[in-house]
Amino acid sequence: MAPNRYNRFVHFNRLHDWNLTSAQARDLQNRLALDVCRLGNVAEPRFIAGIDVSTPFRARGMGTAAVVVLEYPGLELVETQTVRGNIDFPYVPGLLTFREAPLILQAFEKITHTPDLFIVDGQGIAHPRRLGIAAHLGLFFDTPTIGCAKSRLCGTYIEPASEAGNFTELLDNGESIGAVLRTKNNVKPLFISVGNKISIEDAIFWIMRCCRGYRLPEPTRFAHQAAGKFNTGANLQQT
């Protein structure tokens, strides 16, 4: 029997509790990083999810997580789910997951389409302990996941050529941890890295396939808009 792609209860791995100290969180990252799969090719997906979190300055201690689902290849938006709530974990560089992931997982529990690929606004393995938010969530989802960050967290690189599609390696102490990808002519590049169950080559391919004339790929662009609109009080249609 074919899998139900309209399952009202989309499940994920519940790997651990979120009530941790900063030291415990770092130890957990070091352990979970060993489980990330950096290989894999994504078959033609039907649904691609985008994930982003907005934490407005004026709403300290609050955040909004958005999970959107787009149907490929047209990249039509078919579902938007948002959750607003408290962010309990303090801001600590490298521990973004522990601030944002609990809200993301609450939003994910509401979706009715089963994604074949996730694109997360944030780092995958391009992280000091090789477990940024995209890699961490990729283990929860057990599905191909890509980290698509707007800025660099660690590593060094040579600026890619100015035309869309060009990229260079992101290196950290000689290890290749991602790619610096130009997604639009003459605009700042994005920092792409493996989240889980995908190769960096395939990650670059799918990011470019999801771009439609903007710097951000459509899944995270829609997720960014959804989280921002929710915070400003705009009405969002949830399908």
Q: Language-model segments: which ranges?
A:
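A short acidic-Thr-Gly-centered motif at the start of a beta-strand
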Residues: 35-44
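C-terminal binding/interaction regions
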Residues: 9-36, 101, 106-107, 150-151, ...
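Short hydrophobic alpha-helical runs that function as membrane-insertion/retention elements
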Residues: 144-149
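Short, well-ordered, mixed-charge alpha-helical segments that flank or form enzyme active sites
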Residues: 58, 126-129, 153-157
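A glycine-rich, hydrophobic loop/mini-helix early in the fold
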Residues: 57-114
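Catalytic-site beta-strand/loop segments enriched in glycine and acidic/polar residues
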Residues: 105-135, 141-143
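Two-metal-ion RNase H-like nuclease active-site motif
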Residues: 46-56
